[in-house]
């Protein structure tokens, strides 16, 4: 596993998993669990060249671990309870 992705996974340890979303070309392919409109927007608009990144939503306890592979974006949503 990519070391950056491993480090970013560790940032989400002890957080409550809420849902996931798979996106291609800015359009959702699949959604699971609890994903709100703001989280969906962030994942769909993410276009970084980084392998992975943990995003903290403004004024929220939500973390989104985003990873890219083969032009797809996977967003895993966690909440600090």
From Swiss-Prot:
GO terms for cellular component: fungal-type vacuole membrane; Ragulator complex. Transmembrane segments: none annotated. GO terms for biological process: regulation of TORC1 signaling. This is Uncharacterized protein C23D3.16. It comes from Schizosaccharomyces pombe (strain 972 / ATCC 24843) (Fission yeast).
